[in-house]
Amino acid sequence: MRLGKRIVLILNKIDLVPRSNALAWLQYLRHEFPTLPFKASTQQQRHNLSQGTSMTWKSRTGSDAEWAGGAESVGTREILQLIKNYSRNLNLKSSITVGTIGAPNVGKSSLINSLKRSRVCSVASTPGHTKVMQGIMLDRHVRLLDSPGIVFSDANAPPGATAEEIAAAAEAAML
């Protein structure tokens, strides 16, 4: 990226697609950027949201499988480890800022809630719930930014745009 920012793709709502589709998208997207699968917590309590232990799949048929669901988040530990590795490798005395960028209703606020293990960002099932950007301190080294959904115009992300072109448009929107 032109500003030296690192991009990591989070394939959210992984529990809503068949295993074969998720694995194919993970393989494809990892050619461009580090990509991690994720499922946000759907627990109702406000604090101490639990995290699943690993990315496991439950066989449904002989040819395909579906996500072994539950209310806990899955993929959180891997994302936290990646963020902490980036933070440690930069060897900074201050915190790093991790922004969430995506279309409306893709789970940016839910991702932050799952990482923080607390309901720090308001969420709703309707698109456009997050109106302004807000910063959340994950710990003393990492600050998370929750952002409103970005809707790309045809000029910014034409059909068939590469991941690099979409990332550049998203970066421009965050400036």
Q: Where would I find each of the regions flagged by the language model?
A:
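N-terminal switch/interaction subdomains of large nucleotide-dependent motors and GTPases
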Residues: 34-39, 44, 122, 131, ...
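Intrinsically disordered, low-complexity regulatory regions enriched in Ser/Pro/Gly/Thr
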Residues: 2-3, 27-30, 90-94, 103-105, ...
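Flexible, glycine-rich phosphate/dinucleotide-binding loops
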Residues: 16-17, 44, 107, 132, ...
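Glycine-rich phosphate-binding P-loop
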Residues: 96-125, 147
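Helix-rich effector regions associated with P-loop NTPase G domains
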Residues: 3-6, 126-175
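Canonical P-loop GTPase G-domain recognition
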Residues: 2-8, 14-97
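Short coil/turn segments at secondary-structure boundaries
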Residues: 21-23, 40-41, 48-51, 112-117, ...
